[in-house]
Regions:
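Substrate-binding pocket helix/loop in short-chain dehydrogenase/reductase
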Residues: 100-101, 105-113, 209, 213
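Active-site helix of classical SDR
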Residues: 124, 159, 167
Length: 253
């Protein structure tokens, strides 16, 4: 248990289910109070209640479409009103759309970039304002596709490469507050294949097979959401107090 995360206020986007929900559980297990933000209004309320009941921490469900900057500003204003501060942000909301590049329609391209990159930027912006001089930690979720793209997912790869660059820029901008003592640390995790419902649906649809996944991974299996969440908890904790501007590849090799 990382005691320095107890009673911290942690804002997690895309946390109604999947990887984001696993993140929320891991931080709650450390004693953090969780703001669960997700576009799925009913589901995020259910998830917030489940975590509060299981871990005995405070939770706050927020319906949030991260592609909307006004909605992001409003969500962080609600956090300020409720808690008065923010200690950790995890940008987990994201989508991917498969389509050959020669046929990719503009509206789908915009949707991927708006959620994955614009949403991440403006959530970081508002978190940075709320964290202020007290400092904090931001963990962005990138992807192995940011450096090893696969066919048919060009906008996704572009968006995640942008997340990597954003992570490094913000780490440089926000690393010198009060001689670094109260800096805002900004890091990213670049997972590979994760056994989430989204990927398992792809397996069932025949888009990719487990054998194909195992063939390219030295570890010979997909990650569990909990394994990626453990990395996020580490990066947000004081154990990683000298780690910033890094893109950590948690991809099984």
């Amino acid at each position: 248990i990382m005691k320095n995360l107890k009673d911290k206020i942690v804002f997690i986007t895309g946390s109604a289910q999947g990887l984001g929900y696993s993140m929320a559980e891991k931080f709650a297990a450390e004693g953090s109070h969780i703001v669960l933000a997700d576009i799925k209004a009913e589901k995020v309320v259910e998830s917030a209640k489940a975590i509060a009941d299981k871990y005995g921490v405070e939770t706050m469900p927020v319906q949030l479409d991260v592609s909307s900057v006004p909605a992001i500003i409003e969500a962080f204003a609600k956090v300020k009103e409720r808690f008065g501060r923010l200690d950790v942000l995890v940008n987990c909301a994201g989508i991917q759309i498969r389509c050959p590049s020669k046929e990719f329609p503009e509206e789908k391209y915009d949707k991927v970039l708006d959620i994955n990159l614009k949403g991440t930027f403006f959530c970081c912006q508002q978190a940075g304002v709320l964290m202020g001089e007290k400092g904090g930690a931001i963990v962005n979720i990138s992807s192995g596709n940011s450096v090893r793209p696969t066919p048919g997912r060009a906008p996704y790869a572009i968006s995640k490469a942008g997340v990597n660059a954003l992570t490094k820029v913000l780490a440089a901008e926000w690393g010198e507050d009060v001689n670094g003592k109260h800096a805002i640390r900004v890091n990213a995790i670049a997972p590979g294949f994760i056994a989430t419902d989204l990927l398992l649906d792809g397996l069932h649809m025949g888009i990719i097979s487990e054998k194909q996944i195992e063939a390219v991974l030295p570890y010979r299996r997909m990650a569990t959401p909990e394994e990626i969440a453990d990395v996020a908890v580490f990066l947000a904790s004081d154990e990683a107090r000298y780690v910033t501007g890094q893109v950590l590849f948690a991809d099984g090799g």
